[in-house]
Swiss-Prot record:
HAMAP family for the chain: Ribosomal_bL34
Single GO term (MF): structural constituent of ribosome
Superkingdom of source: Eukaryota
Region feature Disordered, mapped onto this chain: 24-46
Gene name in the database record: rpl34
Name this polypeptide is given: Large ribosomal subunit protein bL34c
Gene3D superfamilies xrefs: 1.10.287.3980
Amino acid sequence: MTKGTLQGSKRKKIRISGFRARMKTPSGRSILNERRRKGRKKIMAS
């Protein structure tokens, strides 16, 4: 059997789509604000 194609990594996920990564850029901050405005329970993936 071959390996599956998706080998997930928690560290990579957090570095790319975590809170600190979102706060670094203006567009990331706007994403967080939109999710807050929408009333999301979780504002980021992690």
